[in-house]
Amino acid sequence: MFKGKVVVAQGGGPTAVINQSMVGAVLESRKFRNVELVYGAVHGVRGIVDEHFLDLTQETTHNLEMVAETPSSALGSTREKPDLKYCQEIFKVLKAHEIGYFFYIGGNDSSDTVRIVSEEAAKADYGLRCIHIPKTIDNDLVVNDHTPGFPSAARFVAQAFSGVNLDNQALPGVYIGVVMGRHAGFLTAASALGKKFQDDGPHLIYLPERTFDVDTFVSDVKEVYDRTGRCIVAVSEGIHDASGEPIITKLAEEVERDAHGNVQLSGTGALADLLVSVVKKKSGIKRVRGDTLGYLQRSFVGCVSDVDQREAREVGEKAVQYAMWGQTNGSVTIHRTGFYSVDYQLTPLLDVAGKTRTMPDSFIAANGHDVTTDFLMYLRPLLGRGMPDAYRLRDNRVAKVLNR
């Protein structure tokens, strides 16, 4: 444990609980006498380079607690990935401000950022403790049982499809909902948690872990529609064909990519529009509608899992404890124990950074377009208390008089 200042930053997509992790790290840091000041970097590593800091030592505990319960990233975020030159600029600022502890809250790309900064600090012989705090609605961080942000987003998806199912029952047709998830289908699969009755939707769930064939998709939709008179489909934005090419790229001549080289899958309704058009054209079904859940999944106010909030706070607190009491850098990871409880560990950055976790085969039905009971058992405890329920009128039909 050495004297110094703390910097906390948030990276990647906002979530409903990322502020819990930030506040957890800030309040825990303020408990240690060796911590001189606690800074928040505005817009992630870009804020460090620009020396855009907020002094969170001066922030009241009450206001921090209010911010903790507020969705999205209170410090602002970034998608930037530091290279060597970028890291050298980071070190220049960190040294000038005498910062000794760096906590970065984020997902895959953010964990890789922490790894790079950590390695460059070691090369420069600069005493900097670097801890990655997990966050991603995609739930695709390796080693972790699940990641903060995912349970609340999953709760939103489950409730959204529950509502869509009720709407679709009243006015039957085909509904296609596109859900976030580039490589991992956890969030799309969460749509199944909104089902209560046997004929509830989603009736079909398509995940990036399985190859997507357009003709097979249309055939599946038509089979369900012919059998039930309606069909609700949950589709991951990351679905791809047999060659590995994302279906979305078939729509555009130029595909936009972010700073990490990732194809921009979100922020457009193109995939939903494509699938709607294909189903209409090849199946002959007239009433086909599509939606893209988009950014609503990430930080929807009023749809937060209490389990997610608690664990997001705790990974922030544990990050500080590991930094103060330990001698190594790393990533805080979540491990399930028993039916449902969790334990936290500090995992080497190399074991987490830049790696992607996908849904295991045991979570995906043999037919490739549904989930298993194992997945439902895995996810249900994460959604938290107070999930809304839906009911139906009993089918007490009155006999016809005119027999028409």
UniProtKB/Swiss-Prot annotation:
Gene Ontology CC annotations of this record: cytoplasm
UniProt note: pH dependence: Optimum pH is 7.2 for the forward reaction and 8.6 for the revesre reaction.
Catalysis performed (reactions): beta-D-fructose 6-phosphate + diphosphate = beta-D-fructose 1,6-bisphosphate + phosphate + H(+)
Enzyme Commission no: 2.7.1.90
Keyword line: Cytoplasm, Glycolysis, Kinase, Magnesium, Metal-binding, Transferase
Pathway(s) it belongs to: Carbohydrate degradation; glycolysis; D-glyceraldehyde 3-phosphate and glycerone phosphate from D-glucose: step 3/4
Cofactor dependence: Mg(2+)
InterPro entries in alphabetical order: ATP_PFK, PFKA, Phosphofructokinase_dom, PKF_sf, PPi-PFK
Enzyme class: transferase
Binding site for substrate: 136-138, 180-182, 237, 295-298
Active site: 138
Gene Ontology process terms (BP): fructose 6-phosphate metabolic process
Top-level taxon of origin: Bacteria
Gene3D superfamilies: 3.40.50.450, Phosphofructokinase domain (3.40.50.460)
Main location: cytoplasm
Site keyed Important for catalytic activity: positions: 135
Any GO molecular function: 6-phosphofructokinase activity
Binding site for Mg(2+): 108
UniProt name for this protein: Pyrophosphate--fructose 6-phosphate 1-phosphotransferase
Species assigned in the record: Rhodospirillum rubrum (strain ATCC 11170 / ATH 1.1.1 / DSM 467 / LMG 4362 / NCIMB 8255 / S1)
